[in-house]
């Protein structure tokens, strides 16, 4: 009987993987000045990057129009701010799908509809309770219009985990595990969707460059390995460790067969003076190795998910100079904001050797001086600065403790000083996790 059950599991597993094939796409963000037009961007995605799928952060009709009659698989997104509206109204959800998705479905290969972006990282905790109800409503709306091929999901960062090391001890944060994540996993499992994950080995490596090998983080061939004491599984790169930590967290909540999709990954091609290893050479190396590994047939999977097909999107198409935060946030692009390549990468995985000569790394050691994330000179939008200050302070109670009246770093009537302090504190903590 056990043999029969095993055969059934293997057959089902094969059928599941047959529905998807190893594909690496690219995230197409729009937070930059003078970016190429949507039509030119799509041309670059297809010819320069050779990507098979693309993910955008809204449902911009100008961009969706550029995807008409292409072979690109497309992922679109519902913005965080309208999640409560969808959660509370099926008619609102139906209307949104009818006017943002339905007009393009005959000519654009929309395959994923994502509800929000990193909602469970947001300091707006009231939003969390609206997430899963919104996902359910959106799925009903898609079914209403017979759009059965579109999977519903939501991207999560690595900070949804309470524990990620060793991988076998992966677990979700206690404030979200039972009330939000478990119902979400149940929905994703029943609808045969994915756990969408934003995962960046750069950030944990940059926090511990003396303890984590750079080659291990870049997926280079190396003798460095790590053996999980709980499972005996051997790891040869940091990304596999991070993916399996999420897999075990999902498994421990009762969903061992739920598939993972990498919604974002990448390596910064530049950054601030204290952001070690953020350079073109490392970015090219990581993304090239990633593309080769995640387009391989048969699929490699991970130590805990051998042979698993893991669809993925690299971040990002362009450098985006309007993104807030540390310098790395604006420098994940494979292309410059004008469309010129920062380096060559073939996301189809077909190119094994590259002709371009990569520049030598200049920031291979940790910066010894002091560095701050500050409000840029010349910024006059005080409302935007207040919003940034409020956002940073709301993320954790302790971030802005020292700039309260009577504390060491308080300066009366100095909004810019307080905002700079808060942003520095916020980003120094956020970059300690890999997503």
Regions found by a protein language model. Give the residues of each.
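Substrate-binding and catalytic surfaces of secreted/luminal carbohydrate-active proteins
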Residues: 136-140, 148-153, 161, 176-430
């Amino acid at each position: 009987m056990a043999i029969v059950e095993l055969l059934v599991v293997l057959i089902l597993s094969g059928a599941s993987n047959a529905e998807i094939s190893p594909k690496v796409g690219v995230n197409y963000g729009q937070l930059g000045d003078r970016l190429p037009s949507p039509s030119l961007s799509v041309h670059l995605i297809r010819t320069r990057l050779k990507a098979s799928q693309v993910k955008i952060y809204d449902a911009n009709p100008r961009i969706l129009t550029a995807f008409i009659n292409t072979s690109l698989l497309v992922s679109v997104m519902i913005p965080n701010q309208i999640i409560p509206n969808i959660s509370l109204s099926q008619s609102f959800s139906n209307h949104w799908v009818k006017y943002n998705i339905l007009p393009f479905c005959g000519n654009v290969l929309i395959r994923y509809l994502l509800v929000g972006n990193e909602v469970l990282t947001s300091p707006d905790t009231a939003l969390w309770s609206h997430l899963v109800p919104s996902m359910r409503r959106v799925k009903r709306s898609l079914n209403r219009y017979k759009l059965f091929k579109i999977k519903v999901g939501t991207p999560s960062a690595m900070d949804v985990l309470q524990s990620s090391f060793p991988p076998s001890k992966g677990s979700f944060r206690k404030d979200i595990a039972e009330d939000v994540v478990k119902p979400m996993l149940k929905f994703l499992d029943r609808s045969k969707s994915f756990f969408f994950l934003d995962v960046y080995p750069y950030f944990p490596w940059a926090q511990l460059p003396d303890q984590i090998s750079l080659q291990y983080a870049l997926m280079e061939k190396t003798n460095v390995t790590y053996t999980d004491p709980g499972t005996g599984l051997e790891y040869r790169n940091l990304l596999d460790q991070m993916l399996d930590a999420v897999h075990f967290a999902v498994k421990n909540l009762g969903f061992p067969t739920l598939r993972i999709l990498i919604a974002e990954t990448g390596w910064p091609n530049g950054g601030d003076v204290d952001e070690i290893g953020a350079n073109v050479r490392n970015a090219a190396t990581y993304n090239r190795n990633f593309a080769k590994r995640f387009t391989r047939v048969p699929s490699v999977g991970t130590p805990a998910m051998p042979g698993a097909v893991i669809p993925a999107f690299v971040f990002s198409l362009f450098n985006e100079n309007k993104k807030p935060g540390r310098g790395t946030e604006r420098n994940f692009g494979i292309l410059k904001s004008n469309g010129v390549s920062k380096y060559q990468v073939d996301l189809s995985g077909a190119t094994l050797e590259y002709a371009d000569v990569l520049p030598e790394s200049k920031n291979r050691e940790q910066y010894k001086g002091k560095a701050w994330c500050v409000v840029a000179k010349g910024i006059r939008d005080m409302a935007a600065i207040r919003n940034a200050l409020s956002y940073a302070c709301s993320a954790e109670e302790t971030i802005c403790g020292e700039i309260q009246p009577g504390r060491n770093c308080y300066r009366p009537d100095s909004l810019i000083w307080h905002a700079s302090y808060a942003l520095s504190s916020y980003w120094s903590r956020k970059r300690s996790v890999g997503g």
